[in-house]
Amino acid sequence: MAGVVTQNVDGLHLKAGTSPERLVEIHGNTREFVCMACGDRGPIDVVVERVRSGEEDPRCLECNGILKSATISFGQNLVPEDIDRAQSAAAVADCFLAIGTSLTVYPVAAMPEIALRAGSNLAIVNAEETPYDAYADAVIRGQIGEVLPAIVALV
């Protein structure tokens, strides 16, 4: 597996056993905090504990900047290194699986095209049509919670 690129921020891919080195959480995650000023990062539990201890609005210990969960907020730029890692994974994939995504939000929507141009097969599992359905080697319509267990049972 070249990698897993997810737009989810819930950390379930890690809990399911995906290697951190192969995981790209393109919209960030809720496990960490990030300072909006200096970029300092750490476990979100540290900030939560500071709130529990009485701090109303914990500030960055490095620069006194504003802390937030390490998720991408509306209007905030994606992390360039994450985009690069996602594009690199797409470029070396033998089979690119697009699961549970409309493939309409860029830059993630461009990943299947990168994979196809590199010679990858494309399979799409989604409840609705996507712009890449006509280019896919396989398209499965349905709810991923039902479709994926059925696929796993066949393998």
Q: Where in this protein do the model-derived segments appear?
A:
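Conserved catalytic alpha/beta core of Sir2/sirtuin-type deacylases, generalized to analogous enzyme cores
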Residues: 1-155
